[in-house]
Regions:
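Active-site helical microenvironments for divalent-metal-assisted chemistry
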Residues: 1-321
Length: 321
């Protein structure tokens, strides 16, 4: 699966998000209008994201995450391309998903705003999505995101797609800012993902869900933070370990009959490598960790994220493709 790293921690430029998707100028202009309108509605109530950023910062992230999930679903899960009207409607929902909840407007206001950009059918559908994503009343987040809330998402066409993009955006931002918040958002995803699984029979929503299932696992590796651990392996270590792992038929050694043989060979090599430089505390552990990382893409990406190896994906492909 191809991953497109999103590591910006400044105010996003609109065209940085959408230029890469080859939108027609007409579609780009409409999305720009939707974005500007949503930004102004949130600004009118003095709403900020994380206390300091214009709220459209978060809305851009949600739209960007939706587009990433969508394009990945098309490429890797055989999802069908959306027509321009449906795509525009979903981007409208991404930009307006918090307006009823936060901006003192109601369902029919959202529908009225949507009618500026597309026909009644799509305007109503966009309003339905935004309405379904509006929290219930409650004293805690768990109260507000109760079973009724997730049931509403599950039974509203395409709503789970936008909610998933919203959760991805929250997890990525909190991964940079607060590990506790990241864990809260991750646990929320784990608890709710099956509750909001689309019940409307739209295969596209299930394609998005399949992408998100894999993508969310990799967030800690794809978006490395500054608190990386020190890598104690030399280039020679990496080369030797990678060659051994490469003998294991693209790394899937754990499920192959010759696993014991490869593990024995690795153990002997690790002992030689360790004796070569005993003073490096923790090196033995990293050698073992790297070998296991070479066995499976997810482990490899996590290893690279942990130790700040930004070219991890390229290095993996170098040995296994």
């Amino acid at each position: 699966m191809d991953y497109e790293l999103y590591t910006k921690d400044e105010y996003l430029d609109f065209h940085d998000i959408f230029d890469k998707y080859n939108f027609s100028q007409e579609l780009l202009n409409k999305v720009d209008g939707i974005r500007s309108l949503a930004a102004s509605i949130h600004a009118e109530v003095n709403q900020y994201y994380d206390d300091s950023k214009p709220y459209v910062y978060h809305l851009d992230m949600v739209a960007d995450q939706f587009m990433y999930l969508y394009k990945t679903a098309v490429k890797h899960f055989e999802a069908k391309e959306l027509d321009d009207d449906t795509l525009l409607m979903l981007l409208f929902a991404a930009y307006f998903h918090d307006t009823i909840e936060d901006c003192r407007i109601h369902y029919y206001d959202v529908e009225k705003y949507a009618l500026r950009f597309f026909r009644k059918k799509y305007a109503t559908q966009a309003a339905e999505i935004v309405f379904s994503l509006t929290e219930e009343k409650g004293k805690t987040r768990a109260d507000r995101h109760n079973d009724k809330y997730y049931n509403g998402i599950a039974n509203t066409t395409y709503a789970s797609c936008i909610k998933t993009a919203d959760m991805c955006a929250n997890m990525i931002y909190s991964w940079y800012k607060s590990r506790k918040r990241y864990e809260d958002y991750y646990n929320e995803w784990t608890d709710c993902k099956m509750k909001m699984l689309d019940n409307t029979g739209i295969e596209f929503s299930h394609n998005i869900f399949c992408v998100a299932q894999e993508y969310i696992k990799f967030i800690p590796a794809l978006y490395p933070t500054l608190d990386k651990k020190e890598l104690l392996l030399s280039e020679e270590d990496v080369e030797n370990i990678s060659k051994i792992a490469g003998d294991c038929a693209s790394g899937n050694y754990l499920i192959r009959p010759r696993a014991d043989e490869y593990l024995k060979k690795f153990s002997e090599t690790m002992e030689i490598l360790s004796k070569a430089d005993d003073e490096k505390t923790g090196r033995d552990k990293q050698i073992t960790e790297y070998f296991y990382a070479c066995s499976e893409p997810k482990l490899f990406y996590l290893f690279c994220g942990k130790y700040g190896l930004k070219d991890g994906k390229d290095e993996y492909e170098r040995y296994y493709n």
